[in-house]
Swiss-Prot record:
In A.calidoustus, the austinoid gene cluster lies on a contiguous DNA region, while clusters from E.nidulans and P.brasilianum are split in their respective genomes. Genetic rearrangements provoked variability among the clusters and E.nidulans produces the least number of austionoid derivatives with the end products austinol and dehydroaustinol, while P.brasilianum can produce until acetoxydehydroaustin, and A.calidoustus produces the highest number of identified derivatives. It comes from Aspergillus calidoustus. Its cofactor is heme. This is Cytochrome P450 monooxygenase ausI. Its EC number is 1.-.-.-.
């Protein structure tokens, strides 16, 4: 592939090598000054001979959970670590309330920093004021207001996707769960993104390309990434996939415009919502649509795979959930009210998110972790101005900081916290004052699965609807159990991310449903 890219021979010239060295030194000095101003301890410094910080960063990737635990054991409130994106601050959950709505601590710049949004080809992750505002408003306002109208179409589309993607035989059949779920979700939700039949496969391909490129680039020192991005095979594949996506989305926009002109009806899709949310400002509709699609795609697939792997080992929970689905559907049909009354299912999803939250992005897993300690990070921000918190902690402009989510594993808050209890939040909802806070879509300082405060995930209500509709269909139509000899864990862990084991195999068989959804 290198013959198609920039000639790399000049990299061997002495002046280029010298420039790289000088750039590296200046970068390290600059990044170091921002956290040393507070005399904050650096947890994983590998010393002066770790010139490009490869040893420190690899330790973070390999042992992030244990490092974070060690950090809070030794330095209760805040400490610094070298990560894939430079030196970051890690703060205790006590800071969550100060972070929740602080105007100078932003989410989008954090995402851009985590996933190379400043580089060509990574526009999906780039923070841009107009697109960021439209992204939030279209999800928080237009999508939320349309959710009731979307329930029935989503139920129909997801049901069809399951019929198309899942086995149709009544005998047991082994499937690679992650692959089937990805294609089910991409097809079942495609109508709000794109009508083109090529969209579901494109979404899967694009998610893989973005994840592979991001992971490959993260293996290089930060100061060299702009250079190596020009010739890394994974990045070149991402560029090609992005070009194909632009062509596909342009074709779909023309089709939707013609369809609306012929029917006179405003369709329920993001292109229409972007127009409303833009208030006349120019914006990149293609990038916005892709950003929203991939932001939801990863989270939806991750949650659904995690819950299905749990259900494959718990037939009693499957029976209880089926009884709830039958009772609720007979009373309410497909509606927002029905989804609200699926309280045990709601609890099961919230408990999966408590035990194994997604955290950050789509890193490619390289280490398999089967045990869980009590520390992880759940909320990330970048300071867009210098920020001074109540205790005097100074966060310099451009500095990224993460809030630990380890209260989700706190025995004082969640008894027997290491144990997965699908009924935990179902019981909590019955306690006085807990009906709202114990719901799947309710972020609190004790449960940061969807973030916290005014910048909590704005699409969580849509995500909850898609997940519940999907699981209703699957519970009614399929039995599930672990595949023979399948002994792998439910999750992969890499750096500060916990991802579903998408390679896990299960056995499924078609069953005769008690009710027709």
């Amino acid at each position: 592939m290198l013959h198609e890219t920039t000639n790399l021979a000049p990299l061997g010239q002495p002046w280029i090598a010298g420039l790289v060295v000088v750039s590296a030194v200046l970068y390290l000095l600059y990044s170091t000054q921002r956290w040393r101003a507070n005399n904050i301890p650096l947890l994983n410094d590998a010393g002066p001979f770790d010139f490009l910080q490869a040893t420190a960063v690899n330790r973070f990737r390999r042992d992030a959970r244990q490092l974070i635990k060690s950090g809070f054991d030794s330095h209760r409130d805040v400490f610094a670590m070298r990560t894939d994106v430079g030196v970051e601050l890690f703060a205790s959950p006590e800071y969550a309330d100060q972070f929740r709505n602080h105007p100078s601590l932003k989410v989008f710049p954090f995402t851009a920093k985590m996933h190379h949004g400043h580089l060509p080809g990574f526009e999906l992750c780039r923070s841009q004021p107009v697109e960021d505002r439209i992204f939030i408003e279209s999800v928080r306002v237009q999508l939320a207001q349309s959710l009731g109208k979307l329930i029935q179409p989503l139920a129909s589309d997801i049901g069809q996707a399951i019929s198309d993607r899942w086995p149709s035989e009544s005998g047991w059949e082994e499937i690679a769960l992650g692959s089937v779920v990805e294609r089910t979700i991409s097809q079942g939700t495609s109508s709000v993104y794109c009508l083109d039949k090529a969209w579901p496969e494109f979404v899967v391909k694009m998610e893989m390309a973005l994840g592979m490129a991001s992971a490959a680039l993260s293996a290089w020192p930060v100061m060299l990434r702009r250079i190596v991005a020009k010739f890394l095979p994974e990045c070149l594949e991402l560029y090609r996939t992005m070009d194909a996506g632009r062509e596909l989305m342009s074709r779909d926009m023309r089709r939707r415009t013609a369809l609306q002109a012929s029917t006179g009806e405003a369709p329920l899709n993001f292109f229409e919502w972007f127009k409303e949310a833009s208030h006349g400002e120019e914006h990149d509709e293609l990038i916005l649509n892709l950003r929203i699609a991939f932001a939801s795609m990863h989270g939806l697939c991750d949650h659904l795979v995690k819950i299905l792997l749990r259900l494959s080992e718990d037939p009693q929970l499957v029976d209880d959930l089926r009884k709830e689905v039958i009772q609720v559907y007979k009373t309410h049909g497909w509606s927002k009210t029905a989804l609200y009354h699926l309280k045990l299912m709601d609890s099961a999803f919230k408990e999966v998110q408590r035990v194994d939250p997604i955290l950050f992005g789509m890193p490619t897993p390289i280490s398999l972790v089967q045990t869980h300690s009590n520390y992880e990070t759940a909320v990330g921000r970048v300071a867009v101005d210098d920020v001074t918190l109540k205790d005097g902690l100074v966060i310099r402009k451009g500095q990224s900081i993460r809030i630990s989510g380890h209260t989700m594993w706190d025995e004082d808050k969640y008894p027997d916290a290491a144990h997965f209890d699908a009924y935990r939040f179902y019981k909590l909802r019955q306690a006085p004052g807990q009906e709202n806070t114990a719901q799947f879509t309710s972020p609190t300082s004790d449960h940061l699965g969807f973030g916290y405060g005014g910048r909590a995930c704005p699409g969580r209500f849509f995500a909850a609807a898609v997940l519940k509709i999907s699981l209703c269909h699957l519970l009614m139509k399929y039995d599930i159990k672990p595949a023979d000899g399948e002994t792998g864990p439910h999750v992969w862990e890499f750096a500060a991310a916990i991802n579903a084991n998408m390679a896990a195999k299960v056995l499924v068989r078609r069953r005769q449903p008690e009710i027709q959804l």
